[in-house]
């Protein structure tokens, strides 16, 4: 089977990237062919597999206009279509794609009728600030069920009105276009907590499975 793996960072930035690369190795060990779709960066790891890159978006230093691409990037839509035409995957496994890659890549994949599996490494599907904590560092679920203006009122995204507004607009776009409830075919969560919260927020429990991140036990012998 040919699997296209998607993640916005193609270097070891955090846990989701570790998962992304180790999943690729595990798939290859089981005889599958993999390719990667991510952002350009000098720190990117060369894997020896097919790799497709889009222009890097730095949300901390980029222009305000460029930041609007986090909602829908026409460029990344075209790049994904090109990658799909070239690699012809049987399935696309999406990891962290929100903001830098944008929901436009999901549209490109769905237009090809290719199944999409999404691993939700965080709770961004529910909380525009990703943390489920407000700007006062208090546990918060006020943005659930599409009430994203709460994020703007509290400046939950790094204390910034602009970043919180962009996060809220992104959340509204995803909800209106049913990215998580309809467009993505199956969702993997690393914990039961994430699964429960997604179900509470409207995602069907039939399309979610809690699957803890795997560990290579030989490294701990």
Task: Give names to the regions the model predicted.
Residues 1-43, 85-87, 105, 109-115, ...:
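N-terminal subdomain of nucleotide-sugar transferases
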Residues 17-18, 45-50, 105, 128-133, ...:
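Short aromatic-enriched loop/helix-cap "lid" or pocket-rim segments at secondary-structure transitions
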Residues 29-91, 151-152:
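A conserved catalytic-core segment of Leloir-type glycosyltransferases
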Residues 51-56, 110-111, 134-138, 205:
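Short, hinge-like loop/turn segments at secondary-structure boundaries
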Residues 82-101, 115-119, 124:
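Short N-terminal targeting/anchoring amphipathic segment
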Residues 111, 124, 136-186:
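Membrane-proximal helix-turn-helix segments that form the acceptor-binding/catalytic region
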Residues 193, 214:
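Carbohydrate-associated surface elements
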């Amino acid at each position: 089977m040919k699997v296209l793996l998607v993640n916005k960072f193609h270097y070891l930035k955090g846990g989701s990237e570790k998962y992304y690369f180790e999943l690729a190795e595990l798939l290859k060990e089981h005889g599958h062919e993999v390719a990667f779709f991510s952002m350009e960066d000098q720190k990117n790891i060369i894997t020896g597999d097919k790799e497709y890159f889009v222009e890097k978006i730095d949300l901390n230093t980029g222009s305000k206009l460029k930041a609007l691409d986090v909602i829908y990037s026409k460029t990344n839509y075209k790049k994904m279509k090109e990658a799909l035409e070239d690699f012809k995957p049987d399935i696309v496994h999406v990891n962290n794609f929100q903001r830098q890659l944008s929901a436009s890549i999901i549209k490109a994949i769905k237009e090809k009728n290719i199944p999409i599996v999404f691993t939700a490494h965080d709770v961004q599907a529910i909380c525009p600030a990703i943390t489920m904590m407000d700007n006062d560092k208090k546990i918060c679920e006020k943005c659930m069920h599409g009430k994203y203006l709460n994020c703007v009122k509290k400046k939950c995204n790094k204390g910034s009105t602009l970043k919180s507004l962009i996060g809220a607009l992104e959340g509204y776009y995803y909800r209106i276009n049913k990215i998580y409830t309809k467009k993505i075919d199956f969702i993997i969560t690393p914990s039961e907590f994430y699964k429960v919260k997604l179900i509470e927020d409207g995602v069907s429990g039939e399309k979610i499975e809690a699957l803890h991140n795997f560990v290579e036990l030989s490294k701990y012998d």
